[in-house]
């Protein structure tokens, strides 16, 4: 039965890391339907996706992308020059009709396509941020271009982190040609590449001992030949949360579970980079990490116990 009709959503404005994002919050029914759709789409999209495309795929976060670029650098092959480019306002400029045509080549079930159409009823010219389905369709839209860059253009290394492209090759001319190809391919999909694209020499040391070139900034990491650091805004975010926790401890206040979990999660960036010295100076004196982990464990047990008691009460009442 084709009875489901979505509601019209009011946008929510979120400011994060100096960026303003327009987010749409789906209803519970919409979220349930989108999860069902993704359960069917996941083997189709993830199974045929470019292996070096990261973000929004399970098991393909920034850490896996970081490890990929580290391997390039450690191999020493095809890393003389790097090119980087972003898609301008990616989600807000994706036209659903273009994604639909690509889907029709892979999905032949008309009812399933109709279900996706219904979810996107009020978003013909954008992919709504906040919809679980959006990130999958956005990645699917760029799959063909990913393979073209690697197979047709023969670029040595290529990583895409959602709408950010990072390419590496010894031949600078090939990188310029690749950026031109990406710009033209995006134009056919009614998308635009930002004007801040760049092609540059990767940092290295000359015979006279002088360092030249630049590090690569991608996925929140700063890549050098001998180390990987974290971008400044992430370090400031970690320190800001550490100061909040320190202030609550000084005032004898209870630590919020969400804040503690967020802090421990962000420490993963430090674990997988060469920023331990920064941690000793800026974080260790403010927060006892072991204590925070014990608090998380204790509070999680309390939450689970209360949830179990409520479930038991409901079962007895039934």
Question: Could you describe each region identified by the protein language model?
Answer:
Residues 55-64, 166-169, 199-208:
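Beta-rich nucleic-acid/ligand-interaction surfaces
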Residues 43-47, 109-110, 190:
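Short helix-interrupting loop/turn segments at helix-coil junctions
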Residues 67-162, 166-183, 196, 200-201, ...:
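Conserved polymerase palm-domain catalytic core
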Residues 1-101, 313-318:
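Conserved two-metal-ion catalytic palm core of "right-hand" nucleic acid polymerases
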Residues 26, 31, 35, 119-122, ...:
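Right-hand nucleic-acid polymerase module
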Residues 15-16, 46-49, 81, 161, ...:
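Short acidic (Asp/Glu) and glycine-rich catalytic loops that position anionic groups and cofactors
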Residues 41-48, 147-149, 274-277:
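Short helix-capping/linker segments at secondary-structure and domain boundaries
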Residues 47-62, 152-162, 284-287:
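Short alpha-helical "patches" and their helix-cap loops
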């Amino acid at each position: 039965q084709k009875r489901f009709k979505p509601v019209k959503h009011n946008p929510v404005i979120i400011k994060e890391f100096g960026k303003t994002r327009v987010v749409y919050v789906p209803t519970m029914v919409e979220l349930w339907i989108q999860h069902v759709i993704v359960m069917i789409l996941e083997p189709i999209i993830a199974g045929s996706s470019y292996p070096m495309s990261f973000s929004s795929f399970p098991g393909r976060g920034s850490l896996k992308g970081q490890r990929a670029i580290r391997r390039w650098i450690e191999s020493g092959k095809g890393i003389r020059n790097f090119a980087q480019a972003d898609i301008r306002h990616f989600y807000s400029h994706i036209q659903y009709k273009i994604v639909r045509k690509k889907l029709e080549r892979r999905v032949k079930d008309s009812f399933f396509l109709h279900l996706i159409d219904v979810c996107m009823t009020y978003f013909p010219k954008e992919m709504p941020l906040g919809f679980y389905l959006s990130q999958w369709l956005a990645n699917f839209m760029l799959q063909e271009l990913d393979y073209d860059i690697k197979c047709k253009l023969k670029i040595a290394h290529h990583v895409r982190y959602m709408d950010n492209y990072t390419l590496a090759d010894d031949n600078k001319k090939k990188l310029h040609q690749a950026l031109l190809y990406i710009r033209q391919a995006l134009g056919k999909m009614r998308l635009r590449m930002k004007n801040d694209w760049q092609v540059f020499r990767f940092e290295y040391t000359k015979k006279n001992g002088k360092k030249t070139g630049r590090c690569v900034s991608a996925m929140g990491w700063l890549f050098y030949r001998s180390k990987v650091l974290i971008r400044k805004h992430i370090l400031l975010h970690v320190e800001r949360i550490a100061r909040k926790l320190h202030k609550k401890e000084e005032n004898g206040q209870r630590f919020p579970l969400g804040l503690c979990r967020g802090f421990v999660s962000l420490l993963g960036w430090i674990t997988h980079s060469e920023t331990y010295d920064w941690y000793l100076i800026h974080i260790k004196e403010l927060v006892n990490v072991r204590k925070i982990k014990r608090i998380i464990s204790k509070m999680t047990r309390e939450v689970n116990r209360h949830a179990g008691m409520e479930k038991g009460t409901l079962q007895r009442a039934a």
